[in-house]
Curated annotation (Swiss-Prot):
GO molecular function: enzyme activator activity; integrin binding; metalloendopeptidase inhibitor activity; molecular function inhibitor activity; peptidase inhibitor activity; protease binding; zinc ion binding
Annotated spans, Involved in metalloproteinase-binding: 27-30, 95-96
Species of the source: Rattus norvegicus
Gene: Timp2
Post-translational modification: The activity of TIMP2 is dependent on the presence of disulfide bonds.
Subunit architecture: Interacts (via the C-terminal) with MMP2 (via the C-terminal PEX domain); the interaction inhibits the MMP2 activity.
Protein name: Metalloproteinase inhibitor 2
GO cellular component, one term: neuronal cell body
Amino acid sequence: MGAAARSLRLALGLLLLATLLRPADACSCSPVHPQQAFCNADVVIRAKAVSEKEVDSGNDIYGNPIKRIQYEIKQIKMFKGPDKDIEFIYTAPSSAVCGVSLDVGGKKEYLIAGKAEGDGKMHITLCDFIVPWDTLSITQKKSLNHRYQMGCECKITRCPMIPCYISSPDECLWMDWVTEKSINGHQAKFFACIKRSDGSCAWYRGAAPPKQEFLDIEDP
């Protein structure tokens, strides 16, 4: 076999490998603070998944049916969203394309943030904030009622390594990855980035609503 033929076979092999790996690479998400997840979502609910089934959701450009997983849910509480309760949640059929797997049977409670689809439906992906309810801190649970919403005009900037800086007064530096090597660290569990009366934003700690003027860090 000549050098040209070997080069062609190698190129075709690499192309095939890239094609096979592409679906897994398609689901890539940047970590977000729980407050950012709340602010970015159309719908935020506490719910249980009762049942699941695969359904058709139209066709792709080639006429092939698009499959999705439909979860029938029992909504326990809505923190953000439409007036109508959410009855069904949809997601992609595989984690390779950002599909989410929920335990069904109505025993496990979740906090679920995602995009509204109207008429009691929403769509979720692995890039959305979906966690078991019992893993949230008490502060996080209470912040869902009002405090996260108060900070939606602020910008939370993740610090991947030292040094890192804010570029405007309405930013809060999220340091969990640097200080704890975790995106579920102290700031994620116990702090919210809230706008102050002078228009700047700062981290606030505590379950009670912030005072009109507050320090960067307050104890509960």
